[in-house]
A protein has these predicted regions:
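Cytochrome P450
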Residues: 1-402
Length: 402
Protein backbone atom coordinates (compact mmCIF):
# COMPACT_ATOMS: atom_id res chain seq x y z
CA UNK A 1 0.00 0.00 0.00
CA UNK A 2 1.18 3.50 -0.75
CA UNK A 3 -0.21 6.75 0.55
CA UNK A 4 -0.80 10.16 -0.98
CA UNK A 5 -1.72 13.07 1.24
CA UNK A 6 -2.88 16.54 0.28
CA UNK A 7 -0.72 19.62 0.63
CA UNK A 8 -0.54 20.93 4.17
CA UNK A 9 -2.78 23.95 3.63
CA UNK A 10 -6.16 24.70 5.19
CA UNK A 11 -8.24 21.56 5.40
CA UNK A 12 -11.20 21.12 3.11
CA UNK A 13 -14.62 20.43 4.60
CA UNK A 14 -14.25 16.80 3.56
CA UNK A 15 -10.84 16.51 5.25
CA UNK A 16 -12.14 18.15 8.40
CA UNK A 17 -15.04 15.71 8.52
CA UNK A 18 -12.68 12.75 8.04
CA UNK A 19 -10.33 13.99 10.75
CA UNK A 20 -13.19 14.53 13.20
CA UNK A 21 -14.49 11.05 12.46
CA UNK A 22 -11.14 9.41 13.26
CA UNK A 23 -10.66 11.46 16.43
CA UNK A 24 -14.15 10.48 17.62
CA UNK A 25 -13.31 6.77 17.55
CA UNK A 26 -12.17 4.97 20.71
CA UNK A 27 -8.38 4.87 20.65
CA UNK A 28 -8.40 1.08 20.91
CA UNK A 29 -10.42 0.83 17.69
CA UNK A 30 -7.68 2.36 15.53
CA UNK A 31 -6.22 -0.18 13.11
CA UNK A 32 -3.53 1.25 10.81
CA UNK A 33 -3.53 -1.98 8.78
CA UNK A 34 -7.14 -1.48 7.68
CA UNK A 35 -6.81 -1.19 3.88
CA UNK A 36 -9.94 0.98 3.66
CA UNK A 37 -8.08 3.84 5.38
CA UNK A 38 -5.67 4.32 2.47
CA UNK A 39 -7.69 5.20 -0.64
CA UNK A 40 -9.97 7.36 1.52
CA UNK A 41 -7.03 9.29 2.99
CA UNK A 42 -8.26 8.59 6.54
CA UNK A 43 -4.89 7.03 7.36
CA UNK A 44 -3.42 10.54 7.62
CA UNK A 45 -5.56 11.22 10.67
CA UNK A 46 -5.10 7.73 12.12
CA UNK A 47 -1.34 8.21 12.22
CA UNK A 48 -1.56 11.84 13.31
CA UNK A 49 -3.65 10.80 16.29
CA UNK A 50 -1.51 7.79 17.18
CA UNK A 51 1.73 9.80 17.08
CA UNK A 52 0.17 12.33 19.45
CA UNK A 53 -1.83 10.10 21.80
CA UNK A 54 -0.58 6.51 21.59
CA UNK A 55 2.68 6.15 19.65
CA UNK A 56 3.13 2.53 20.79
CA UNK A 57 -0.34 1.26 19.98
CA UNK A 58 -1.93 -2.17 20.42
CA UNK A 59 -4.61 -3.38 18.01
CA UNK A 60 -6.55 -6.31 19.46
CA UNK A 61 -7.85 -9.32 17.58
CA UNK A 62 -11.40 -7.91 17.59
CA UNK A 63 -10.31 -4.82 15.68
CA UNK A 64 -8.33 -6.40 12.86
CA UNK A 65 -8.55 -9.32 10.48
CA UNK A 66 -4.78 -9.76 10.72
CA UNK A 67 -4.62 -10.83 14.35
CA UNK A 68 -3.33 -8.72 17.27
CA UNK A 69 -0.27 -6.55 16.71
CA UNK A 70 1.53 -3.44 17.97
CA UNK A 71 2.20 -0.27 15.99
CA UNK A 72 5.20 2.04 16.26
CA UNK A 73 4.35 5.40 14.70
CA UNK A 74 7.11 7.79 15.80
CA UNK A 75 10.50 8.08 14.12
CA UNK A 76 12.61 7.37 17.21
CA UNK A 77 10.69 4.23 18.19
CA UNK A 78 10.77 2.88 14.64
CA UNK A 79 14.51 3.46 14.40
CA UNK A 80 15.08 1.83 17.79
CA UNK A 81 13.22 -1.32 16.75
CA UNK A 82 14.62 -1.50 13.23
CA UNK A 83 18.21 -1.39 14.49
CA UNK A 84 17.72 -3.94 17.29
CA UNK A 85 17.33 -7.33 15.61
CA UNK A 86 18.21 -9.10 18.85
CA UNK A 87 14.94 -7.95 20.45
CA UNK A 88 12.88 -7.38 17.28
CA UNK A 89 13.32 -10.45 15.09
CA UNK A 90 12.56 -10.55 11.37
CA UNK A 91 12.58 -14.34 11.32
CA UNK A 92 9.62 -15.62 9.31
CA UNK A 93 7.75 -12.30 9.21
CA UNK A 94 7.55 -9.37 6.78
CA UNK A 95 4.20 -7.63 7.37
CA UNK A 96 1.39 -7.80 9.90
CA UNK A 97 -0.78 -9.79 7.49
CA UNK A 98 -1.73 -13.20 8.82
CA UNK A 99 0.72 -15.94 7.74
CA UNK A 100 -0.34 -18.16 4.87
CA UNK A 101 -2.34 -21.18 5.98
CA UNK A 102 -1.18 -24.76 5.25
CA UNK A 103 -3.92 -24.96 2.61
CA UNK A 104 -2.63 -21.82 0.88
CA UNK A 105 0.94 -23.12 1.06
CA UNK A 106 -0.11 -26.43 -0.48
CA UNK A 107 -2.01 -24.68 -3.29
CA UNK A 108 1.19 -22.97 -4.42
CA UNK A 109 4.08 -25.26 -3.58
CA UNK A 110 2.81 -28.82 -3.27
CA UNK A 111 3.61 -30.74 -6.45
CA UNK A 112 2.18 -33.90 -4.97
CA UNK A 113 5.36 -34.91 -3.19
CA UNK A 114 4.99 -32.90 0.03
CA UNK A 115 3.61 -34.73 3.06
CA UNK A 116 1.03 -33.05 5.32
CA UNK A 117 3.77 -32.73 7.95
CA UNK A 118 6.07 -30.93 5.49
CA UNK A 119 3.29 -28.54 4.52
CA UNK A 120 2.53 -27.79 8.18
CA UNK A 121 6.23 -27.23 8.91
CA UNK A 122 6.59 -24.87 5.96
CA UNK A 123 3.57 -22.85 7.06
CA UNK A 124 4.91 -22.71 10.63
CA UNK A 125 8.29 -21.36 9.45
CA UNK A 126 6.61 -18.45 7.72
CA UNK A 127 8.35 -16.41 5.05
CA UNK A 128 11.95 -17.31 4.16
CA UNK A 129 13.77 -14.50 2.38
CA UNK A 130 16.54 -12.00 3.02
CA UNK A 131 13.87 -9.66 4.46
CA UNK A 132 12.56 -12.26 6.89
CA UNK A 133 15.80 -13.61 8.31
CA UNK A 134 18.07 -12.71 11.20
CA UNK A 135 21.87 -13.06 11.21
CA UNK A 136 23.75 -15.08 10.13
CA UNK A 137 21.31 -16.27 7.42
CA UNK A 138 20.41 -12.71 6.50
CA UNK A 139 23.98 -11.74 5.61
CA UNK A 140 24.42 -14.90 3.52
CA UNK A 141 21.27 -14.27 1.46
CA UNK A 142 21.86 -10.53 1.10
CA UNK A 143 25.43 -11.14 0.02
CA UNK A 144 24.31 -13.56 -2.69
CA UNK A 145 22.47 -10.88 -4.67
CA UNK A 146 23.79 -7.51 -3.49
CA UNK A 147 26.31 -7.28 -6.33
CA UNK A 148 23.40 -6.97 -8.76
CA UNK A 149 22.55 -3.52 -7.39
CA UNK A 150 26.07 -2.46 -6.46
CA UNK A 151 27.10 1.09 -7.47
CA UNK A 152 29.44 -0.37 -10.11
CA UNK A 153 26.75 -2.50 -11.72
CA UNK A 154 24.18 0.30 -11.62
CA UNK A 155 26.71 2.63 -13.24
CA UNK A 156 26.98 0.18 -16.14
CA UNK A 157 23.19 0.05 -16.42
CA UNK A 158 22.68 3.83 -16.26
CA UNK A 159 23.22 4.58 -19.98
CA UNK A 160 20.74 1.85 -20.94
CA UNK A 161 18.13 3.10 -18.46
CA UNK A 162 18.57 6.69 -19.70
CA UNK A 163 18.22 5.57 -23.32
CA UNK A 164 15.04 3.67 -22.54
CA UNK A 165 13.59 6.56 -20.54
CA UNK A 166 14.24 8.93 -23.43
CA UNK A 167 12.65 6.57 -25.95
CA UNK A 168 9.56 6.12 -23.77
CA UNK A 169 9.11 9.87 -23.32
CA UNK A 170 9.64 10.52 -27.04
CA UNK A 171 6.91 8.00 -27.86
CA UNK A 172 4.22 9.68 -25.74
CA UNK A 173 1.25 11.18 -27.59
CA UNK A 174 1.02 14.95 -27.86
CA UNK A 175 -2.22 16.84 -27.28
CA UNK A 176 -4.20 13.90 -25.97
CA UNK A 177 -4.74 12.12 -22.68
CA UNK A 178 -2.70 9.04 -21.82
CA UNK A 179 -2.03 6.84 -18.80
CA UNK A 180 1.32 8.00 -17.38
CA UNK A 181 1.50 5.14 -14.88
CA UNK A 182 1.11 2.51 -17.59
CA UNK A 183 3.07 4.12 -20.42
CA UNK A 184 5.96 5.49 -18.37
CA UNK A 185 6.18 4.33 -14.76
CA UNK A 186 5.29 0.68 -15.31
CA UNK A 187 6.97 0.41 -18.70
CA UNK A 188 10.37 1.75 -17.64
CA UNK A 189 10.30 -0.23 -14.40
CA UNK A 190 9.34 -3.46 -16.19
CA UNK A 191 12.14 -3.00 -18.72
CA UNK A 192 14.65 -2.47 -15.93
CA UNK A 193 13.36 -5.45 -13.94
CA UNK A 194 13.64 -7.69 -16.99
CA UNK A 195 17.27 -6.62 -17.34
CA UNK A 196 18.02 -7.19 -13.65
CA UNK A 197 16.49 -10.69 -13.84
CA UNK A 198 17.75 -11.32 -17.40
CA UNK A 199 14.15 -12.11 -18.28
CA UNK A 200 12.88 -11.81 -21.88
CA UNK A 201 11.93 -8.19 -22.58
CA UNK A 202 8.91 -9.27 -24.62
CA UNK A 203 7.52 -10.87 -21.44
CA UNK A 204 8.44 -8.01 -19.08
CA UNK A 205 4.85 -7.18 -18.13
CA UNK A 206 4.59 -10.68 -16.67
CA UNK A 207 7.02 -9.51 -13.97
CA UNK A 208 4.73 -6.56 -13.23
CA UNK A 209 1.72 -8.86 -13.00
CA UNK A 210 3.45 -11.25 -10.61
CA UNK A 211 4.59 -8.38 -8.41
CA UNK A 212 1.10 -6.88 -8.30
CA UNK A 213 -0.44 -10.22 -7.33
CA UNK A 214 2.21 -10.98 -4.71
CA UNK A 215 1.59 -7.66 -2.96
CA UNK A 216 -2.20 -7.49 -2.94
CA UNK A 217 -5.11 -9.43 -1.53
CA UNK A 218 -7.35 -11.19 -4.06
CA UNK A 219 -10.75 -9.69 -4.78
CA UNK A 220 -12.90 -7.94 -7.40
CA UNK A 221 -10.89 -5.32 -9.25
CA UNK A 222 -7.59 -6.49 -7.73
CA UNK A 223 -4.62 -8.04 -9.56
CA UNK A 224 -6.07 -11.48 -8.78
CA UNK A 225 -9.84 -11.88 -8.62
CA UNK A 226 -9.79 -14.76 -6.15
CA UNK A 227 -7.50 -16.98 -4.09
CA UNK A 228 -7.35 -19.63 -6.81
CA UNK A 229 -6.13 -17.11 -9.40
CA UNK A 230 -3.59 -15.76 -6.94
CA UNK A 231 -2.28 -19.23 -6.10
CA UNK A 232 -1.93 -20.08 -9.80
CA UNK A 233 0.07 -16.90 -10.49
CA UNK A 234 2.35 -17.39 -7.48
CA UNK A 235 2.91 -21.01 -8.50
CA UNK A 236 3.76 -19.82 -12.01
CA UNK A 237 6.36 -17.37 -10.66
CA UNK A 238 7.79 -20.04 -8.34
CA UNK A 239 8.14 -22.52 -11.21
CA UNK A 240 9.66 -19.90 -13.53
CA UNK A 241 12.27 -18.81 -11.00
CA UNK A 242 13.19 -22.39 -10.11
CA UNK A 243 13.67 -23.27 -13.78
CA UNK A 244 15.72 -20.13 -14.44
CA UNK A 245 18.04 -20.74 -11.48
CA UNK A 246 18.60 -24.38 -12.45
CA UNK A 247 19.33 -23.37 -16.04
CA UNK A 248 21.77 -20.60 -15.03
CA UNK A 249 23.80 -23.03 -12.94
CA UNK A 250 24.93 -24.62 -16.20
CA UNK A 251 25.76 -21.27 -17.80
CA UNK A 252 28.56 -18.76 -17.35
CA UNK A 253 28.01 -16.37 -14.39
CA UNK A 254 26.48 -13.00 -15.20
CA UNK A 255 25.42 -9.98 -13.14
CA UNK A 256 21.66 -10.54 -13.15
CA UNK A 257 19.88 -11.56 -9.93
CA UNK A 258 19.08 -15.09 -11.08
CA UNK A 259 22.66 -15.81 -12.16
CA UNK A 260 23.99 -14.38 -8.89
CA UNK A 261 21.73 -16.71 -6.91
CA UNK A 262 22.69 -19.64 -9.13
CA UNK A 263 26.44 -19.11 -8.74
CA UNK A 264 26.82 -17.69 -5.24
CA UNK A 265 29.09 -19.91 -3.11
CA UNK A 266 26.32 -19.86 -0.51
CA UNK A 267 23.29 -20.48 -2.70
CA UNK A 268 23.97 -24.19 -3.12
CA UNK A 269 22.54 -24.53 0.37
CA UNK A 270 19.45 -22.40 -0.35
CA UNK A 271 16.16 -24.24 -0.42
CA UNK A 272 13.74 -23.69 -3.29
CA UNK A 273 11.52 -21.81 -0.86
CA UNK A 274 14.38 -19.46 0.04
CA UNK A 275 15.27 -18.84 -3.61
CA UNK A 276 11.61 -18.07 -4.26
CA UNK A 277 11.47 -15.79 -1.19
CA UNK A 278 14.59 -13.85 -2.19
CA UNK A 279 13.33 -13.55 -5.78
CA UNK A 280 10.00 -12.23 -4.52
CA UNK A 281 11.73 -9.56 -2.43
CA UNK A 282 13.87 -8.49 -5.39
CA UNK A 283 10.90 -8.44 -7.76
CA UNK A 284 8.56 -6.51 -5.49
CA UNK A 285 11.26 -4.16 -4.23
CA UNK A 286 12.41 -3.36 -7.75
CA UNK A 287 8.87 -2.85 -8.98
CA UNK A 288 7.02 -0.96 -6.26
CA UNK A 289 9.52 1.66 -5.13
CA UNK A 290 10.71 2.67 -8.59
CA UNK A 291 7.31 2.66 -10.27
CA UNK A 292 5.58 4.53 -7.45
CA UNK A 293 8.35 7.11 -7.18
CA UNK A 294 8.13 7.92 -10.89
CA UNK A 295 4.35 8.31 -10.66
CA UNK A 296 4.44 10.25 -7.40
CA UNK A 297 6.98 12.74 -8.71
CA UNK A 298 4.61 13.77 -11.52
CA UNK A 299 1.62 13.87 -9.16
CA UNK A 300 3.44 15.92 -6.53
CA UNK A 301 5.05 18.41 -8.90
CA UNK A 302 1.67 18.95 -10.56
CA UNK A 303 -0.05 19.56 -7.21
CA UNK A 304 2.77 21.72 -5.88
CA UNK A 305 3.40 24.22 -8.71
CA UNK A 306 5.79 26.32 -6.64
CA UNK A 307 8.02 23.25 -6.21
CA UNK A 308 7.73 22.53 -9.93
CA UNK A 309 8.88 26.05 -10.75
CA UNK A 310 11.72 25.71 -8.26
CA UNK A 311 12.88 22.53 -10.02
CA UNK A 312 12.61 24.04 -13.49
CA UNK A 313 14.71 26.98 -12.36
CA UNK A 314 17.32 24.72 -10.78
CA UNK A 315 17.57 21.19 -12.29
CA UNK A 316 20.41 20.47 -9.87
CA UNK A 317 17.63 19.84 -7.33
CA UNK A 318 16.55 16.65 -9.12
CA UNK A 319 18.38 14.28 -6.70
CA UNK A 320 16.89 16.15 -3.76
CA UNK A 321 13.45 16.04 -5.39
CA UNK A 322 13.69 12.27 -5.82
CA UNK A 323 14.62 11.79 -2.15
CA UNK A 324 11.79 14.04 -1.01
CA UNK A 325 9.35 12.16 -3.23
CA UNK A 326 10.45 8.84 -1.74
CA UNK A 327 9.99 10.27 1.77
CA UNK A 328 6.66 11.89 1.07
CA UNK A 329 4.94 8.96 -0.62
CA UNK A 330 6.79 6.15 1.27
CA UNK A 331 6.47 3.17 -1.12
CA UNK A 332 6.64 0.61 1.70
CA UNK A 333 4.21 1.59 4.45
CA UNK A 334 5.59 -0.76 7.09
CA UNK A 335 7.65 -3.77 8.01
CA UNK A 336 6.91 -6.14 10.88
CA UNK A 337 9.00 -7.81 13.56
CA UNK A 338 8.38 -10.30 16.37
CA UNK A 339 9.74 -9.65 19.85
CA UNK A 340 12.18 -12.23 21.21
CA UNK A 341 11.67 -11.07 24.80
CA UNK A 342 9.57 -8.59 26.73
CA UNK A 343 10.62 -5.19 25.39
CA UNK A 344 9.92 -1.78 26.88
CA UNK A 345 9.64 0.98 24.33
CA UNK A 346 8.40 4.51 24.97
CA UNK A 347 6.95 3.50 28.34
CA UNK A 348 5.06 0.41 27.18
CA UNK A 349 6.05 -3.24 27.52
CA UNK A 350 5.56 -5.37 24.42
CA UNK A 351 5.38 -9.04 25.47
CA UNK A 352 7.68 -11.68 24.05
CA UNK A 353 6.38 -13.21 20.82
CA UNK A 354 4.09 -10.31 19.84
CA UNK A 355 4.10 -8.85 16.33
CA UNK A 356 5.20 -5.24 15.89
CA UNK A 357 4.58 -3.02 12.84
CA UNK A 358 7.12 -0.27 12.19
CA UNK A 359 5.07 2.28 10.27
CA UNK A 360 7.62 4.06 8.07
CA UNK A 361 4.85 6.08 6.45
CA UNK A 362 3.98 7.57 9.85
CA UNK A 363 7.58 8.14 10.92
CA UNK A 364 8.08 10.12 7.71
CA UNK A 365 5.38 12.52 8.98
CA UNK A 366 6.84 12.88 12.49
CA UNK A 367 7.06 16.63 13.09
CA UNK A 368 9.53 16.10 15.94
CA UNK A 369 12.08 14.84 13.38
CA UNK A 370 11.08 16.55 10.13
CA UNK A 371 10.07 20.19 9.93
CA UNK A 372 6.79 20.74 8.04
CA UNK A 373 6.65 16.98 7.61
CA UNK A 374 3.33 16.90 5.73
CA UNK A 375 4.57 19.34 3.09
CA UNK A 376 6.39 18.47 -0.12
CA UNK A 377 9.60 20.53 -0.17
CA UNK A 378 12.20 19.53 -2.76
CA UNK A 379 15.09 21.60 -1.37
CA UNK A 380 15.14 20.37 2.22
CA UNK A 381 18.47 20.72 3.99
CA UNK A 382 18.74 16.96 4.47
CA UNK A 383 16.46 15.34 1.87
CA UNK A 384 17.69 11.80 2.57
CA UNK A 385 16.58 12.11 6.18
CA UNK A 386 13.68 9.68 5.87
CA UNK A 387 12.57 6.18 6.86
CA UNK A 388 11.46 4.87 3.49
CA UNK A 389 14.39 2.47 3.13
CA UNK A 390 14.43 1.37 6.75
CA UNK A 391 17.43 1.18 9.08
CA UNK A 392 19.99 -1.35 10.18
CA UNK A 393 20.80 -4.67 8.56
CA UNK A 394 17.54 -4.77 6.59
CA UNK A 395 17.96 -1.34 4.97
CA UNK A 396 16.62 -1.54 1.42
CA UNK A 397 19.09 -3.37 -0.81
CA UNK A 398 18.06 -1.46 -3.93
CA UNK A 399 17.91 2.07 -2.53
CA UNK A 400 20.49 3.31 -5.04
CA UNK A 401 18.38 2.00 -7.91
CA UNK A 402 15.27 3.75 -6.58
Amino acid sequence: MTIALSRDTELTAEQTEARDRIYALPLAALNPANPAHYPSGDIRWVFERLRAEDPVHFTSDENTEHGPYWSLTRWADIQAADTNHDAFSAEGIITVARPRTPEQIAAVFNDGTMTPEEIEARAARGSRSLLSMDPPDHEIHRGAVSEGVSPANLAMLEPLIRERAGAILDSLPIGEEFDWVDKVSIELTAMTLATLFDYPQEKRRQLTRWSNILTSLPGPGMAAENEEERAAAVREFFTTISEMVNRRRDEEPRMDFVSLMAHSPHSKDFTEAEIFGDSTVLLVGGNDTTRNTISASVYLLHNNPEQNEKLRANPALIPSMVSETIRWQTPLTHMARRTTRDVEINGKVIPKGDRVAMWYVSGNRDETKIENATEYIIDRKNPRHHLSFGFGIHRCLGNKLA
